[in-house]
Amino acid sequence: MKFSYNWIREFVPGLTQAAAPLERLITMKTAECEGIEEEGKLLTIARVARVETVEPIPDSHNVKAVVDAGPLGRKTVVCGAPNCRPGILTAYAPIGRKVVSGVESDGMLASGAELGINKDHDGIVELNAPLGEPIPGCEPDAAIEIDNKSITHRPDLWGHHGMAREVAAILGLPLTDHAKLDLLPEGVPAIRVQIEDLALCPRYSALVFENVTVQPSPLWLQYRLTAIGLNPINNIVDMTNFVMAELAQPMHAFDADLLKGDTIFVRPAKAGEYFVALNDEEYTLDPSNLVIADASGAIALAGVIGGKGSAIGDTTTRVVLESANFQASSVRKTSSAIKLRTDASMRFEKAQDPSNTVRGLARAIELLREISPGIRLVGGVADQRREIPAPPPIELPLAWLQRKLGRAIEASEVRRILESLAFGVSEPTPGVFSVTVPSWRATKDISIKDDLVEEVGRMIGYDSIAPQAPLVPASVPPGNPSRRFQHDVRNLFVDNGFTEVYNYSFLSEASVRAFGFDSASMIRVTNPIASDQELMRSSLLPGIWRNVTENAKHHESFRLFEIGLEIHRRDTGLPNEIPHLIAAYYDRQGDGQPGLFELKRLARCLMPNAQTVPAAAREFEHTARAAEIQVAGQTVGRLFELHPKLVETGRAAILDLDLRLVQSLTAGETRYTPIRRYPSSAFDLSVLAGLREQAGTLQAAIASFAGPLQESIQFVRQYVGPPLADGVKSVSFRLTVGSPERTLSSEEITAVRNAIIEGMRAKGYELRV
């Protein structure tokens, strides 16, 4: 949003700082500025001149004009404006000599657009001012552009008077106010106002004027609006925009002769109510839209835009001037619903001060008497409002303020700063201020003492507060064993080449059916974020399955895992949330066994005492490759291969663990085992078994015969093929034996090996040694 430097200076007469340093101060103490635009550069040299003679130039649409520029002398100028004629007073700018249409032109006659006064390119500007003088009421200006996002909490800063108040406070200068409330007429209003819901419209003020003359605005008014990015239209509409830009109070003018009845209604729109706006757009409304209406229907969308049917026109002679206050959220909803944001709606959305409505009318009276001579007020002010209690004073202890600021500050300085910002300040108790918040800061900005700290801090300058590290006690936060355990699990799988995935906690009916789960036992979401995410997941498997199928389209092999919550329904209370790990090992080539063994190895890394026990396959598991993972006799998860019907190509091994059970069964004191002083010995054994025999079953059998000297037994490899018979495989294990007390003799090692061989043969297995 743009602020005119000259306009601000009118409210702060003692302002001597140029626009650039002022912009820096505003950025540091009030709101972020985005830059400065120079306005009306040509006005520096332009002077009022009279056209004396006009001659056509052969073969050209231009004319040669001789002008009297007062002290600048008589000049010959080439001009192409259609309104260039003898006797007209216009703007002459001595920009230098140039040959135009074969004639030397000494300077130029300028249009309003070239001067920056308005957008009129159609002809040279016509003036009524003394010869040789600068353009009256128009001098070069600087528009300071403020970032709108930095003033969303400051409704008062959406007008020049509010910004001028900030400038006056920053520089310690007095502030003037152009709104003269004593201009407001007393007496019976010429129009009535009826508000249906005072919460949606806390205040509605209106005045009626007659003997109105609608005409172009004076140049100073056009220039003032153009400099801040508003388009001049006519004197009545321009006046309402001027008041809005000055006081942050949007206003609207209705042609009184086009209104039906003597009452203005503020009410919700009727369902299907039809409305044609000033922008010629047609809208169909509903009760969520607040409207201004007469006896025939809606004449304006409250706080957003006026209606075409009551617009000010060239023949308007009577005007109803509206100055109202609307609920911020109501205006925002209507603006969003019709996809239209206006200068008025942007201000109302910031929660404007209801007391500002009559100030806007007072300022309008003064302006209208200047720009529409002969205008007359009819009746008094129509003013319907809700009584809004004044906010209670805020207690501000000086010691607390200093502690929050991080620096010392005198009580007199605090009082000076707050009073310069129009806060009322008293000190009923020594060292404790009682601060009264002005109405324009109480709507959504200042409510607690912490807000006052910000006011004082920004005015003394945050750069004046020396940085200091906070003095806080350093203590170790309490640990979260579950989080730490999951962190360790995550690191284990990442270190072994797995990629972590994150899936939604929601499932579709289709994915549930694919695994044969009972959707009736799951929690159904009443407002799903998508049609295929209506069930809370009671298993992480459908999610990882979808990851596998999608990645299998692009990769030969990959490893994925997810740590998340299974959500199970309870009969009463909140759902039961169980942390689970699910890991997938996919390979497009091979028989899938490496994936199963790798996942089994990682399970053993988490649970050294885990056992793999063959289990009956579920419908989504490979019929011959399913096992339970058990620790101390309890099942903590499953290891299996996905059924081929779920994986089009390749094989996918899955590890599914209940992390809560795993953590509880593996928790305990970590015991230190001294490094063995005596060497261990290792030997390999290969067991011949059927293809369906589980390696875990064979390993458990070998361990049962190894006796107390065994230290570890590890799976080495599996072989199928010649010279083995069909249906037979060779499974190799490495057994390590030793003693903490002595080095084992070769006889003891042989005894262990023989015990294993005899025991396995007794079970019907043949060994290759």
Curated annotation (Swiss-Prot):
According to its UniProt entry, one GO biological process term is:
phenylalanyl-tRNA aminoacylation
Which reactions is this enzyme annotated as catalysing? Answer: tRNA(Phe) + L-phenylalanine + ATP = L-phenylalanyl-tRNA(Phe) + AMP + diphosphate + H(+)
Enzyme class name: ligase
- Annotated tRNA-binding domain ranges read 40-141
B5 domain: from which residue to which, for each copy? 389-467
Q: What is its EC number?
A: 6.1.1.20
**Record domain FDX-ACB: where:** 676-768
Top-rank taxon, per record: Bacteria
GO molecular function, one example?
Answer: tRNA binding
Residue sites binding Mg(2+) per the record: D445, D451, E454, E455
* Gene3D superfamilies reported in the protein's UniProt record: 3.30.56.10, Bira Bifunctional Protein, Domain 2 (3.30.930.10), Ferrodoxin-fold anticodon-binding domain (3.30.70.380), Nucleic acid-binding proteins (2.40.50.140), Phenylalanyl-trna Synthetase, Chain B, domain 3 (3.50.40.10)
Going by the UniProt record, its keywords in alphabetical order are: Aminoacyl-tRNA synthetase, ATP-binding, Cytoplasm, Ligase, Magnesium, Metal-binding, Nucleotide-binding, Protein biosynthesis, RNA-binding, tRNA-binding
Q: Which cysteines are joined by disulfide bonds?
A: none
Q: Which residues form a coiled coil?
A: none
- Cofactors, names only: Mg(2+)
Q: Which SMART domains match?
A: B3_4, B5, FDX-ACB
Name of the protein: Phenylalanine--tRNA ligase beta subunit
Q: Which InterPro entries match?
A: aa-tRNA-synth_II/BPL/LPL, B3/B4_tRNA-bd, DNA-bd_dom_put_sf, Fdx_antiC-bd, Fdx_antiC-bd_sf, NA-bd_OB-fold, Phe-tRNA-ligase_IIc_bsu, Phe-tRNA-ligase_IIc_bsu_bact
Q: Which GO terms describe its cellular component?
A: phenylalanine-tRNA ligase complex
Q: Does the keyword Glycoprotein apply?
A: no
Q: Name one Pfam family in it.
A: B5
The free-text note explaining how the cofactor binds reads:
Binds 2 magnesium ions per tetramer.
Species in which this protein is naturally found: Solibacter usitatus (strain Ellin6076)
* Record's subunit section: Tetramer of two alpha and two beta subunits.
The entry assigns this protein to a family as follows: Belongs to the phenylalanyl-tRNA synthetase beta subunit family. Type 1 subfamily.
Q: Where in the cell is it found?
A: Cytoplasm
